[in-house]
Design a protein with these regions (language model features):
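Short Gly/Thr/Asp-enriched flexible loops that form oxyanion-binding sites at enzyme active sites
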Residues: 11-22
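Short, small-residue-biased leader/transition segments that mark boundaries at the very start
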Residues: 2-4
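N-terminal glycine-rich dinucleotide-binding loop that anchors FAD/FMN and/or NAD(P) in oxidoreductases
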Residues: 46-61
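A conserved regulatory-domain signal marking ACT and ACT-like small-molecule sensing domains
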Residues: 137-216
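Catalytic phosphate/nucleotide-handling subdomain of diverse soluble enzymes
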Residues: 115-143
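Short, acidic/small-residue loops that bind anionic groups at enzyme active sites
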Residues: 21-34
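Glycine-rich beta-alpha junction loops
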Residues: 7-9, 31-36, 54-56, 64, ...
Length: 216
């Protein structure tokens, strides 16, 4: 069983109830790398304030875990693991794309943590909870996740400053089955190259192999 780790209350409560029902169940808490206050407290054997908190999982962006919840964690939680913001974005995209569900960033910590465990042949429950997320954040998470997966790719190329170049590039991208999202044709960026312009292109792709095909 896997639980999120906020200020410690959720994982403490679930762990205590689960262990009461079945003492053999293993409880694993998951927290963001940029706010690993539970791990810091366990290493010091008492709550300690983090020097910095930086994570997209704002619901678990806790500088210091509570004393009471730390005692529950030490008693009932078998392990605490951490995940990166990159892994959180991957998990968010998986949840939306494959399972048609939306949860807040902190709520998908257990899903992101699954990749760090050997789950084959075991009964594992990843508790996904919390829907405190707005539409703009959802859009940002999806787009950034697509960029990380190579599904959205941006590149720049210098072109001769003469008519027909945009048509040639557009045709090349069409031949490579790349769907254009944005073209930025800037005549004034490379002032040291008077007869050239910079073209920045953003396209939809099918992944890394498709990107390599476009580059080649």
């Amino acid at each position: 069983e896997m639980c999120i780790r906020d200020s410690g209350g959720i994982v403490s409560g679930i762990a205590a109830a689960a262990k009461l029902k079945n003492p053999r169940v293993k409880i694993i808490g998951v927290e963001p790398e940029g706010a690993a206050s539970a791990l810091a407290a366990l290493k010091a054997d008492h709550p300690v304030p983090l020097d910095e908190v930086a994570t997209i999982a704002d619901g678990t962006a806790v500088r210091q875990i509570g004393e009471t919840t730390l005692e529950y964690i030490k008693q009932y939680v078998d392990e605490i693991i951490t995940v990166s913001d990159y892994e959180l974005m991957e998990a968010f995209l998986l949840l939306v794309e494959k399972h048609k569900l939306v949860a807040e960033n902190s709520g998908i910590l257990p899903l992101a943590g699954l990749k760090k465990l050997e789950c084959r042949g075991k009964k594992v429950v990843a508790i996904v909870s919390g829907g405190n997320i707005d539409v703009l954040t959802i859009s940002s998470m999806i787009n950034k996740g697509l960029v990380l997966r190579g599904r959205i790719f941006t590149f720049s190329v210098n072109l001769p400053d003469k008519p027909g170049q945009l048509v040639a590039v557009s045709q090349m991208l069409a031949d490579a089955d790349a769907n254009v999202i944005k073209l930025d044709h800037n005549q004034f960026k490379n002032l040291d190259r008077f007869h050239e312009v910079e073209l920045q292109v953003t396209v939809e792709t099918n992944g890394e192999e498709h990107i390599q095909h476009i580059i080649d």
